[in-house]
Amino acid sequence: MSDDILFVSNGNGKAIFLTSRAVLVKSFCSLSKTCSFKDSCQSCEIVDAAKSYLMGKKSDLNVKSLDGELSAGIGEYKIGKNVLLKVMGLGSCIGVILSDVSTGICGIAHVLLPGASNSGEAKYAETAIENMFEDMIRMGARKNRITAKFAGGAQVFKHMSLDILKIGDRNAISVEETLVKRNIPILAKDVGGEVGRNVIFNPVDGSMIVKYTKGEVLWL
Protein backbone atom coordinates (compact mmCIF):
# COMPACT_ATOMS: atom_id res chain seq x y z
CA MET A 1 0.00 0.00 0.00
CA SER A 2 1.27 3.47 -0.89
CA ASP A 3 2.05 6.15 1.69
CA ASP A 4 0.33 8.78 -0.45
CA ILE A 5 -1.81 8.51 -3.56
CA LEU A 6 -1.89 11.70 -5.58
CA PHE A 7 -4.00 12.87 -8.50
CA VAL A 8 -2.43 15.67 -10.52
CA SER A 9 -3.93 17.41 -13.54
CA ASN A 10 -3.41 20.36 -15.83
CA GLY A 11 -4.97 21.51 -19.08
CA ASN A 12 -3.22 18.83 -21.09
CA GLY A 13 -3.29 15.69 -19.01
CA LYS A 14 -3.64 13.99 -15.65
CA ALA A 15 -1.90 11.30 -13.65
CA ILE A 16 -2.20 9.08 -10.60
CA PHE A 17 0.98 8.72 -8.53
CA LEU A 18 1.65 6.03 -5.94
CA THR A 19 4.32 7.03 -3.43
CA SER A 20 6.39 5.48 -0.68
CA ARG A 21 8.29 7.55 1.89
CA ALA A 22 7.79 10.71 -0.17
CA VAL A 23 9.20 9.07 -3.32
CA LEU A 24 7.20 8.50 -6.51
CA VAL A 25 7.19 4.75 -7.14
CA LYS A 26 4.50 4.26 -9.79
CA SER A 27 2.34 6.37 -12.05
CA PHE A 28 -0.57 6.11 -14.46
CA CYS A 29 -0.55 9.04 -16.87
CA SER A 30 -3.10 9.97 -19.53
CA LEU A 31 -0.26 11.36 -21.67
CA SER A 32 1.76 8.13 -21.72
CA LYS A 33 1.20 7.56 -25.45
CA THR A 34 2.53 10.97 -26.48
CA CYS A 35 4.93 11.84 -23.64
CA SER A 36 8.50 12.59 -24.73
CA PHE A 37 9.77 11.96 -21.21
CA LYS A 38 7.99 8.71 -20.35
CA ASP A 39 11.28 6.85 -19.79
CA SER A 40 12.85 9.43 -17.49
CA CYS A 41 9.87 11.56 -16.35
CA GLN A 42 12.07 14.65 -16.65
CA SER A 43 10.84 18.13 -17.57
CA CYS A 44 7.24 17.19 -16.78
CA GLU A 45 5.22 19.73 -14.84
CA ILE A 46 2.77 17.05 -13.68
CA VAL A 47 5.63 15.06 -12.11
CA ASP A 48 7.14 18.26 -10.71
CA ALA A 49 3.82 19.15 -9.09
CA ALA A 50 3.62 15.74 -7.40
CA LYS A 51 7.17 16.05 -6.09
CA SER A 52 6.49 19.57 -4.82
CA TYR A 53 3.41 18.36 -2.96
CA LEU A 54 5.43 15.62 -1.25
CA MET A 55 7.97 18.24 -0.15
CA GLY A 56 5.23 20.47 1.25
CA LYS A 57 5.51 23.07 -1.49
CA LYS A 58 2.66 24.72 -3.37
CA SER A 59 1.95 24.04 -7.03
CA ASP A 60 -0.02 25.90 -9.67
CA LEU A 61 -1.48 22.59 -10.82
CA ASN A 62 -4.45 20.77 -9.34
CA VAL A 63 -3.06 18.26 -6.80
CA LYS A 64 -5.39 16.09 -4.73
CA SER A 65 -4.48 13.47 -2.13
CA LEU A 66 -6.60 10.31 -1.90
CA ASP A 67 -7.40 8.56 1.37
CA GLY A 68 -5.88 5.18 0.54
CA GLU A 69 -6.86 2.39 -1.81
CA LEU A 70 -9.21 -0.60 -1.87
CA SER A 71 -8.96 -3.70 -4.06
CA ALA A 72 -11.82 -6.13 -4.72
CA GLY A 73 -10.99 -9.80 -5.13
CA ILE A 74 -13.00 -12.23 -7.22
CA GLY A 75 -16.62 -12.25 -6.09
CA GLU A 76 -16.17 -9.19 -3.86
CA TYR A 77 -17.12 -5.55 -3.92
CA LYS A 78 -15.53 -2.72 -1.96
CA ILE A 79 -16.93 0.70 -1.09
CA GLY A 80 -15.11 3.80 0.13
CA LYS A 81 -14.92 7.57 0.04
CA ASN A 82 -12.13 9.44 -1.73
CA VAL A 83 -10.16 6.22 -2.21
CA LEU A 84 -8.48 4.65 -5.22
CA LEU A 85 -10.37 1.52 -6.28
CA LYS A 86 -8.81 -1.46 -8.05
CA VAL A 87 -9.63 -4.84 -9.56
CA MET A 88 -6.72 -6.80 -10.94
CA GLY A 89 -6.32 -9.72 -13.32
CA LEU A 90 -9.64 -9.51 -15.15
CA GLY A 91 -10.17 -12.12 -17.84
CA SER A 92 -13.80 -13.00 -18.46
CA CYS A 93 -14.67 -11.23 -15.19
CA ILE A 94 -16.00 -7.67 -15.17
CA GLY A 95 -14.85 -4.79 -13.00
CA VAL A 96 -17.96 -2.69 -12.26
CA ILE A 97 -17.58 0.81 -10.83
CA LEU A 98 -20.38 2.84 -9.28
CA SER A 99 -19.63 6.37 -8.13
CA ASP A 100 -21.17 9.58 -6.87
CA VAL A 101 -18.52 12.17 -7.71
CA SER A 102 -20.41 14.84 -5.74
CA THR A 103 -19.79 12.99 -2.45
CA GLY A 104 -16.65 11.03 -3.37
CA ILE A 105 -18.42 7.77 -2.47
CA CYS A 106 -17.60 4.97 -4.87
CA GLY A 107 -17.58 1.21 -5.15
CA ILE A 108 -16.01 -1.47 -7.30
CA ALA A 109 -17.13 -5.07 -7.86
CA HIS A 110 -15.20 -8.01 -9.29
CA VAL A 111 -17.98 -9.88 -11.08
CA LEU A 112 -17.36 -13.52 -11.93
CA LEU A 113 -20.70 -14.75 -13.30
CA PRO A 114 -23.84 -13.35 -14.98
CA GLY A 115 -27.26 -13.22 -13.34
CA ALA A 116 -28.28 -13.17 -9.70
CA SER A 117 -27.69 -15.27 -6.59
CA ASN A 118 -30.47 -16.46 -4.29
CA SER A 119 -27.99 -16.47 -1.41
CA GLY A 120 -26.63 -12.96 -2.03
CA GLU A 121 -23.26 -13.94 -3.44
CA ALA A 122 -21.46 -10.93 -4.89
CA LYS A 123 -19.75 -12.99 -7.58
CA TYR A 124 -22.97 -12.68 -9.63
CA ALA A 125 -23.42 -9.49 -11.67
CA GLU A 126 -26.95 -8.53 -10.67
CA THR A 127 -26.45 -9.32 -6.99
CA ALA A 128 -23.15 -7.45 -6.76
CA ILE A 129 -24.50 -4.32 -8.43
CA GLU A 130 -27.74 -4.28 -6.42
CA ASN A 131 -25.97 -4.75 -3.08
CA MET A 132 -23.20 -2.28 -3.85
CA PHE A 133 -25.73 0.33 -4.98
CA GLU A 134 -27.77 0.01 -1.77
CA ASP A 135 -24.67 0.05 0.45
CA MET A 136 -23.43 3.22 -1.23
CA ILE A 137 -26.75 4.95 -0.58
CA ARG A 138 -26.59 3.92 3.07
CA MET A 139 -23.10 5.38 3.20
CA GLY A 140 -24.39 8.73 1.93
CA ALA A 141 -24.26 8.58 -1.86
CA ARG A 142 -27.10 10.31 -3.69
CA LYS A 143 -29.22 7.85 -5.61
CA ASN A 144 -29.77 10.12 -8.60
CA ARG A 145 -26.07 11.01 -8.82
CA ILE A 146 -24.68 7.48 -9.03
CA THR A 147 -23.15 6.58 -12.40
CA ALA A 148 -21.40 3.48 -13.73
CA LYS A 149 -18.35 2.41 -15.69
CA PHE A 150 -17.18 -1.14 -16.33
CA ALA A 151 -14.49 -3.13 -18.11
CA GLY A 152 -13.47 -6.73 -18.71
CA GLY A 153 -15.37 -9.62 -20.24
CA ALA A 154 -12.57 -11.01 -22.39
CA GLN A 155 -13.09 -14.20 -24.37
CA VAL A 156 -10.55 -16.40 -22.61
CA PHE A 157 -11.60 -19.55 -24.50
CA LYS A 158 -10.96 -17.91 -27.87
CA HIS A 159 -10.97 -21.17 -29.85
CA MET A 160 -14.30 -22.31 -28.44
CA SER A 161 -17.49 -21.50 -30.36
CA LEU A 162 -20.11 -22.75 -27.88
CA ASP A 163 -22.16 -19.86 -26.48
CA ILE A 164 -22.04 -21.37 -22.99
CA LEU A 165 -18.27 -20.85 -22.96
CA LYS A 166 -18.55 -17.17 -23.92
CA ILE A 167 -18.77 -16.20 -20.26
CA GLY A 168 -17.13 -12.81 -20.88
CA ASP A 169 -19.87 -11.75 -23.29
CA ARG A 170 -22.56 -13.04 -20.95
CA ASN A 171 -21.04 -11.17 -18.02
CA ALA A 172 -20.94 -7.91 -19.98
CA ILE A 173 -24.58 -8.30 -21.07
CA SER A 174 -25.70 -9.11 -17.53
CA VAL A 175 -23.88 -6.10 -16.08
CA GLU A 176 -25.32 -3.71 -18.65
CA GLU A 177 -28.86 -5.08 -18.30
CA THR A 178 -28.72 -4.69 -14.52
CA LEU A 179 -27.47 -1.10 -14.74
CA VAL A 180 -30.18 -0.20 -17.25
CA LYS A 181 -32.85 -1.82 -15.07
CA ARG A 182 -31.62 0.25 -12.11
CA ASN A 183 -31.58 3.42 -14.25
CA ILE A 184 -27.89 3.92 -13.50
CA PRO A 185 -26.26 5.91 -16.33
CA ILE A 186 -23.37 4.10 -18.02
CA LEU A 187 -20.63 6.66 -18.73
CA ALA A 188 -17.99 4.32 -20.16
CA LYS A 189 -17.26 0.67 -20.85
CA ASP A 190 -14.44 -1.38 -22.33
CA VAL A 191 -15.38 -5.02 -22.85
CA GLY A 192 -14.59 -8.04 -24.97
CA GLY A 193 -11.47 -8.93 -26.88
CA GLU A 194 -8.98 -11.61 -25.91
CA VAL A 195 -6.74 -9.67 -23.53
CA GLY A 196 -6.72 -9.39 -19.74
CA ARG A 197 -7.18 -6.12 -17.91
CA ASN A 198 -6.46 -4.33 -14.65
CA VAL A 199 -8.92 -1.58 -13.72
CA ILE A 200 -8.32 1.43 -11.48
CA PHE A 201 -10.83 4.13 -10.55
CA ASN A 202 -10.03 7.67 -9.46
CA PRO A 203 -12.94 9.26 -7.52
CA VAL A 204 -11.61 12.81 -7.84
CA ASP A 205 -12.58 13.18 -11.50
CA GLY A 206 -14.33 9.85 -12.12
CA SER A 207 -11.63 8.41 -14.39
CA MET A 208 -11.54 4.67 -15.04
CA ILE A 209 -8.02 3.60 -15.97
CA VAL A 210 -7.89 0.33 -17.91
CA LYS A 211 -4.49 -1.29 -18.29
CA TYR A 212 -4.24 -4.20 -20.72
CA THR A 213 -1.89 -7.08 -19.97
CA LYS A 214 -0.16 -6.23 -23.27
CA GLY A 215 0.69 -2.77 -21.91
CA GLU A 216 -1.84 -0.40 -23.46
CA VAL A 217 -3.56 2.00 -21.04
CA LEU A 218 -6.94 3.68 -21.54
CA TRP A 219 -8.40 6.58 -19.55
CA LEU A 220 -12.20 6.45 -19.70
From Swiss-Prot:
The record's catalysed reaction(s) read: L-glutaminyl-[protein] + H2O = L-glutamyl-[protein] + NH4(+)
Look up keyword Hydrolase and say if it applies.
yes
What does the UniProt keyword field contain? Chemotaxis, Hydrolase
Q: Which Pfam families match?
A: CheD (PF03975)
Name any one GO molecular function: protein-glutamine glutaminase activity
Q: What is its EC number?
A: 3.5.1.44
Instruction: Write down the Gene3D superfamilies for this protein, in alphabetical order.
Output: 3.30.1330.200
Q: What biological processes does GO assign it?
A: chemotaxis
Function in brief:
Probably deamidates glutamine residues to glutamate on methyl-accepting chemotaxis receptors (MCPs), playing an important role in chemotaxis.
Similarity comment? Belongs to the CheD family.
What is the recorded name of this protein? Probable chemoreceptor glutamine deamidase CheD 2
Record the organism. Methanosarcina acetivorans (strain ATCC 35395 / DSM 2834 / JCM 12185 / C2A)
